[in-house]
Amino acid sequence: YPTLSWGMALHLSQTTLNRDHDRTDPAGYDSRLGNSLSFYGKFSRPVVRWGRWSAGYTLSFGVAWHDKKYHPHTNIDDVLIGSRWTMYYSSGLYMGFRFLKEWTLKAGVAYFHHSNGALNRPNKGSNNIGPTLALAWTPAEEAIEERGRKFTSPPFHRYFYATVLLGIGGKTFDSDWRRTQYTVGKDNPDYLTTRFHVSPVYEFQTAFMYRYARRWASGIGIDAEYLDLSGTSGDIARYDRWSVGLAAQHEVFYGHLSLRM
């Protein structure tokens, strides 16, 4: 059975960043990535159980606060984090061993991502992969398992369905940022500017799905995006405005919740 939970994670980092070799006017110091505190909700599901052992996966989504971010004068090369608050995502695999009736030791590996959080920085973010170790206390383990053995679900009928999604957003361009960050000198009014032209983006997604099991549905769809380049010039004005592609989609259901990939 899956579990839903919430939690906090403290990420400590001593990472330094320096791009003085790329600059017309070197900064003369090392920037720091800094530390972060993440608040998240987690979906965890054991896929395999044998005796006291189990193996499964976790998915986490939330927000994070950072003690350092990009600053043109004090942290110029931290282009990974552009805002105090960013989006947080994590996914991982684990193996667990229940050494006592209510206690389980879990070890695994996980991927952690903090978004950049700003339109005036490259869309990079901070990415980490590392080991995980957890001690889980489940005082209601036996009661939950007994309830699961007695539970009978209503009949499930397979069916087809279609989805349509519309979206609008904004884009700035990496070429604009790189020019003002590395190429122009301090005498240029665009030097280290944080103001860039934002181009609207219009998105359309549709998919035809088949729900073949209570927990899963799969299908194929079309993704289309239109980039409004009015007000731009130079190489940017020559970018393709349309992007169209086919997308294989999979949706996982749990009660009234679902996650689409």
Ranges and model annotations:
Residues 91-159, 171-177:
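Predominantly the C-terminal beta-signal and adjacent terminal strand-loop region
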Residues 51-53, 97-105, 141-145, 214-218, ...:
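Repeated loop/turn-to-beta-strand initiation elements of outer-membrane beta-barrel proteins
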Residues 10-16, 61-67, 111-117, 137-139, ...:
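Transmembrane beta-strands of outer-membrane beta-barrel pores
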Residues 1, 33-39, 53, 83-89, ...:
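Residues that define the transmembrane beta-barrel architecture of outer-membrane proteins
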Residues 16-24, 67-76, 117-124, 147-149, ...:
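Outer-membrane beta-barrel translocator domains and adjoining extracellular loop/strand segments
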Residues 1-25, 39, 182-251, 256:
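Glycine- and aromatic-enriched membrane insertion/assembly motifs of diderm outer-membrane
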Residues 2-8, 55-59, 105-107, 131-133, ...:
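Transmembrane beta-strands of outer-membrane beta-barrel proteins
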